[in-house]
C-alpha cells in the first residue's frame, strides 16, 4: 500500500486529509507534519511514496519544499494542495517539481490525484481547467 507524508500547517485540514486517505483504503498515512523542516527530517528516516504539500507553510513555503524534495529525493513525487486557484501558483509549483496541484475546494479529489501522480501522470484539479498555465 503506498505511503503518503502529509505536510499541512493547519491541524484540522491535516486531519481531514489523513482521514480521507485512510478511509479510501488505498493509502497508508506515513506521517503528518506541519513544517517543511519536519517534512525533510521525516523523509531522511522514513520511506514514503508521495508527499502531499500545502503551499502555505510557515518559514519555508510549500513551493520551496517541493524544490528541496525534488533535489534531495528525486524519486519521491510531490502533490501540492492550495486554496489558490491561479495560474501563478500552479506554474510555480510545477516549475519547482510538483507532479500535481489540487485546490482545497476539490479536497475530495485528493485520492484520484494521488493515484494519477503515483502512476507517473501530472494531475490538476478540475477547477484549473478554466485557467491557463504553463505545462511542464
What are these regions (language model features)?
Residues 8:
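Conserved acidic carboxylate
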Residues 54, 82:
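Active-site residues of response regulator receiver
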Residues 88-94, 105-136:
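Short, flexible helix-to-coil linker/hinge segments that flank and couple to helix-turn-helix
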Residues 35, 61-64:
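Acidic catalytic/metal-coordinating carboxylates
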Residues 32-50:
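Acidic, metal-coordinating helix/loop segments flanking the phosphotransfer/catalytic sites
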Residues 58:
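The feature encodes the CheY-like receiver
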Residues 63-75:
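Short amphipathic alpha-helix used as the core "switch/output" element in two-component signaling
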Amino acid at each position: 500500500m503506498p505511503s503518503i507524508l502529509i505536510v499541512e500547517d493547519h491541524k484540522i485540514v491535516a486531519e481531514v486529509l489523513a482521514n480521507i486517505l485512510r478511509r479510501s483504503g488505498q493509502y497508508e498515512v506515513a506521517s503528518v507534519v506541519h513544517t517543511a523542516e519536519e517534512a525533510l527530517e521525516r523523509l531522511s528516516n522514513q520511506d514514503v511514496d508521495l508527499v502531499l504539500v500545502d503551499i502555505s507553510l510557515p518559514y519555508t513555503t510549500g513551493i520551496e519544499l517541493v524544490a528541496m524534495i525534488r533535489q534531495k529525493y528525486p524519486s519521491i513525487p510531490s502533490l501540492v494542495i492550495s486554496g489558490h486557484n491561479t495560474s501563478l501558483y500552479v506554474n510555480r509549483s510545477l516549475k519547482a517539481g510538483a507532479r500535481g496541484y489540487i485546490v482545497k475546494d476539490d479536497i475530495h479529489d485528493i485520492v484520484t490525484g494521488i493515484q494519477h501522480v503515483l502512476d507517473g501522470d501530472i494531475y490538476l484539479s478540475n477547477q484549473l481547467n478554466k485557467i491557463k498555465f504553463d505545462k511542464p
